[in-house]
């Protein structure tokens, strides 16, 4: 009888230890997950680079119907929100019906050929913003620098390659300066 009671105590003690271990492990896992999610240093370099230079703040007053669409498009394609909001402000001043003298269309001022390549309708505000964010991200992937991505968005990637940097065109230099802030 004494050995049965002793076996039951050992069994309860083992269960308690196992439960304690599981609880402590769960708490540590939750803390580590939170710490990792909030630590820029622990993020992969490709993710850290997304935010380089993005001490940029969108200071425009527009908060209308396209604002959230633009923020969502930026997030969806890994573009810093403030950078994309500043781009849209510069490109069209939030005018969905804008058409430039060169033929660029909509909020993100997509050229018809670029819109076709991206498979978006440039006259649809949501598709236009999605295409603009996707195209800016593609330029970032190509040049690995947000300022060069902006220059490529404005002057074309070939011009950035040809000049091995921001092309010496006053329009493009001013474009990058206005959006980037320097």
Which sequence ranges carry the predicted segments?
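Solvent-exposed, acidic/flexible segments
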Residues: 56-67, 76-77, 81, 99-104, ...
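Substrate-binding/active-site groove segments that recognize
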Residues: 97-120, 128-136, 151, 157-158, ...
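Cell-wall glycan-active module
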Residues: 1-86, 181-182
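Acidic helix/loop microenvironments that form the catalytic cleft of cell-wall polysaccharide enzymes
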Residues: 92, 135, 145-170, 175
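Short, functionally critical alpha-helical segments immediately adjacent to catalytic or ligand/cofactor-binding
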Residues: 68-71, 78-95, 129-134, 149-156, ...
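Phosphate-coordinating loops and pocket residues in cytosolic domains that bind phosphorylated ligands
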Residues: 89, 112, 162
């Amino acid at each position: 009888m004494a050995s049965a009671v002793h076996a039951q105590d050992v069994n309860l003690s083992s269960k308690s230890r196992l439960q304690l271990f599981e609880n402590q492990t769960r708490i540590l896992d939750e803390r580590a997950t939170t710490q990792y999610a909030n630590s820029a240093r622990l993020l992969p370099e490709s993710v850290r680079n997304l935010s380089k230079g993005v001490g940029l703040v969108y200071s425009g007053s527009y908060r209308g119907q396209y604002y959230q669409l633009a923020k969502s498009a930026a997030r969806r394609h890994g573009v810093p929100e403030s950078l994309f909001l500043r781009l849209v402000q510069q490109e069209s001043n939030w005018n969905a019906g804008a058409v430039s003298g060169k033929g660029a269309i909509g909020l993100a001022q997509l050229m018809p050929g670029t819109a076709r390549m991206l498979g978006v309708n440039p006259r649809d505000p949501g598709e236009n913003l999605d295409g603009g964010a996707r195209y800016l991200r593609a330029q970032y992937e190509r040049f690995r620098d947000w300022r060069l991505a902006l220059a490529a968005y404005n002057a074309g990637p070939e011009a950035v390659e040809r000049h091995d940097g921001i092309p010496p065109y006053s329009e493009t230099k001013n474009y990058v300066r206005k959006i980037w802030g320097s």
